């Protein structure tokens, strides 16, 4: 491909078909199955913990399923909101906003389902602090996504210009050794904020729901 000067993903290169098949199997089907497995595993784990706890009743066992259903509906609405947001100039911002829309709908649906007050008895009778923990966890997840976008993207995140990728590109001018060193240093540095966020999320969730 390089010697003949054929562009990337050109149909004249027979290897493109195999490459696209691999992309779909690994990046789409494989990643989707992995996310689904993690999602279902977390729901089942929460249900087992609730079932084995003497302080929690049947409502706590049903809560992960109910919140998962609300999350599904919110995610579908968030995906379809892309048809409205895609007309903007910033594609990255549009994708980011779909996440925010889905998260807000999920939080609203979760609180309405659990809240005992003006709306009367919630669908299930659980402590509202548990929902605070759920919201905190989703906030941490979104924040980690924004940090990842900062360290792996080239577009500004909420007006903050990323310096990681341009720095690696600048270091690459002097050779592969500095490229590897810069990439390794940025990669290691990029894990610092997510670690702090996860730790804060664990302590916060224990405070609200523990």
Question: For each predicted feature, which ranges?
Answer:
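Hydrophobic packing and interface segments
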Residues: 1-210
